[in-house]
């Protein structure tokens, strides 16, 4: 349906590109299926699975519990309820406003308003639900693709693609070259003109027949922008093409662990797959042996006088003729083997509990958690996960903010912001508590400064330098807070002038009072000379 043939990365078409890049993705799919097998199998089903598939439950629950626990803590640290991102002006613009603290405060107030609008948009469109599912996919499969639709209407939730539903190709630096997604949709749900074009090229189809819709986004060499179009049954859909700047592409491929030179990432579970598989086998053996051991079987001497029929019919307290030596119960006598298996299983479970952070119980269950609890979780995540924060901040949080800025500016929901002057910054880890952390920093800084009051009279201490170092250590920008030397001199001169005026007024008032008391006639003459009517 397209009038002109595409060139560059879009030359082969969406379906052909998808089929070609699927071979590179297959190894990552296999690893994701193995990881899901020992955690939550339904998170990454096999290609042959469908809605009616009854997944085999793992013999151990450490994998599933650890996955949900780690995803919840990542969600709390990366996307807290407070603002987890900040809009700041560039360093050059900030230096221009250093001499105008009021102007700098107004700019910061305006940027805070934009932040609140973005956060409200995220909450009202249920982004957190999809983001939590995305984090679970990253832990199991290591890859996920987010799509942020254009703000049309009052509800625009984002869409998540599993690794099995898209392909991606990157350059040597990790930049996205092209992405192809596959959506399955009923033929009757397509627009009428699209159905007509598909039937014209491929024959009639039933209305409930499922067809594949491919969306191809690729980098254009000439313009440097991303071009997008959709394709059904090798037919390009008219009106589906779009152009996106490189910093505002609504298709965001996210990786959990980045490997240099690879288009896809590795999962967190993959790093501990050996322990997960070993624990699964040990738990299966222990459970089966426990079931066998729990089966009670009595043995009776066939040559003895004790009759099993009488024993089974006897009630509690009855007397049955027989000999104790004729009866014995079957035992496996495998306690030593059980002890070894249990010890190894406990060691593996302890390692996995540390890896998935199952040992931390400081976070209570409730609707509201304190900033100290969030700070503890973020600190523990930083110690355990290492560089995961840096990857997610660059591949998930920062692109998300940039896309939302572009989309909300295009729909006039936020004012136009100059790209060269406004820079979005992402807060992760201990800084992910957002604007509430700013208030906490200010309170800590003021408390530390207040503790310096007893040192005012010490001639050996430079309090101005100490105050500045305290602010820098906490992370407070002192522009507009601490007075400069010029501002101090201006205030001192203003205070001196005000004091001089007050002293002169007091002295003049005292002189007039004395004159009026000593000589009323002289007071009247002075008043008449000044043009005043003395009464």
Curated annotation (Swiss-Prot):
Family, as annotated: Belongs to the podoviridae portal protein family.
Superkingdom assignment: Viruses
GO biological process assignments: symbiont genome ejection through host cell envelope, short tail mechanism; viral DNA genome packaging
Assembly and oligomerization: Homododecamer. Interacts with major capsid protein. Interacts with the tail tube proteins gp11 and gp12. Interacts with the terminase large subunit. Interacts with the internal virion protein gp14.
Pfam families tied to this protein: Head-tail_con
Source species of the chain: Enterobacteria phage T3 (Bacteriophage T3)
Any single GO CC term annotated in Swiss-Prot or TrEMBL for this entry: viral portal complex
Annotated function: Forms the portal vertex of the capsid. This portal plays critical roles in head assembly, genome packaging, neck/tail attachment, and genome ejection. The portal protein multimerizes as a single ring-shaped homododecamer arranged around a central channel.
Matching HAMAP family: PORTAL_PROTEIN_T7 (MF_04120)
The entry's keywords: Capsid protein, Viral capsid assembly, Viral genome ejection through host cell envelope, Viral genome packaging, Viral penetration into host cytoplasm, Viral release from host cell, Viral short tail ejection system, Virion, Virus entry into host cell
InterPro entries: Connector_podovirus, Portal_prot_Caudovirale
Name of the protein this chain belongs to: Portal protein
Record carries keyword Electron transport: no
Compartment list: Virion
Keyword Mitochondrion: no
């Amino acid at each position: 349906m397209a009038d002109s043939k595409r060139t560059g990365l879009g030359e082969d078409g969406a379906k052909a590109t998808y089929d070609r890049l699927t071979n590179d993705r297959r190894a990552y799919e296999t690893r994701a299926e193995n990881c899901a097998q020992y955690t939550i199998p339904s998170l990454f089903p096999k290609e042959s699975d469908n809605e009616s598939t009854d997944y085999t439950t793992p013999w151990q629950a450490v994998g599933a519990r650890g996955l949900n626990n780690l995803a919840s803590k990542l969600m709390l640290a990366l996307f807290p309820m407070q603002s987890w991102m900040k809009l700041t002006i560039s360093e050059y613009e900030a230096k221009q406003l250093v001499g105008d603290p009021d102007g700098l405060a107004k700019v910061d107030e305006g940027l805070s308003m934009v932040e609140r609008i973005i956060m409200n948009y995220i909450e009202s469109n249920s982004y957190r639900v999809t983001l939590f599912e995305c984090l679970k996919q990253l832990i199991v499969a290591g890859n996920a693709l987010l799509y942020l639709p254009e703000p049309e209407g009052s509800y625009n939730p984002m869409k998540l693609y599993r690794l099995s539903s898209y392909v991606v190709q990157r350059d040597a630096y990790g930049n996205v070259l092209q992405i192809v997604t596959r959506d399955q949709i009923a033929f009757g749900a397509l627009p009428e003109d699209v159905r007509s074009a598909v039937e014209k090229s491929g024959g009639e189809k039933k209305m409930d027949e499922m067809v594949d819709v491919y969306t191809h986004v690729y980098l254009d060499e000439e313009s440097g922008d991303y071009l997008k179009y959709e394709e059904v049954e090798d037919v390009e859909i008219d009106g589906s093409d779009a152009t996106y700047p490189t910093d505002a592409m609504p298709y965001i491929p996210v990786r959990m662990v980045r490997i240099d030179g690879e288009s896809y990432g590795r999962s967190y579970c993959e790093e501990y797959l050996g322990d997960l598989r070993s624990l699964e086998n040990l738990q299966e053996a222990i459970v089966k042996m426990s079931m066998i051991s729990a089966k009670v079987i009595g043995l009776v001497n066939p040559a003895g006088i004790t009759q099993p029929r009488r024993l089974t019919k006897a009630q509690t307290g009855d007397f049955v003729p027989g000999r104790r030596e004729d009866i014995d119960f079957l035992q496996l006598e495998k306690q030593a083997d059980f002890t070894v298996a249990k010890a190894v299983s406990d060691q593996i479970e302890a390692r996995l509990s540390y890896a998935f952070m199952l040992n931390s119980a400081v976070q209570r269950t409730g609707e509201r958690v304190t900033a100290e609890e969030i700070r503890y979780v973020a600190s523990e995540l930083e110690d355990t996960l290492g560089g995961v924060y840096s990857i997610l901040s660059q591949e998930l949080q920062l692109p998300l903010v940039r896309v939302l800025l572009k989309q909300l500016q295009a729909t006039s929901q936020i004012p136009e912001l100059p790209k060269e002057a406004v820079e979005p910054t992402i807060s992760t880890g201990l800084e992910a508590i957002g604007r509430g952390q700013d208030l906490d920093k200010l309170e800590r800084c003021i408390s530390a400064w207040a503790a310096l009051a007893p040192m005012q009279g010490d001639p050996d201490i430079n309090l101005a330098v100490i105050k500045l170092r305290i602010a820098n250590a906490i992370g407070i920008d002192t522009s507009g807070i601490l007075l400069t030397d010029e501002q101090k001199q201006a205030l001192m001169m203003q205070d001196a002038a005000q004091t001089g005026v007050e002293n002169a007024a007091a002295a003049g008032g005292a002189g007039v009072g004395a004159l009026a008391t000593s000589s009323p006639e002289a007071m009247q003459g002075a008043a008449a000379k000044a043009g005043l009517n003395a009464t």
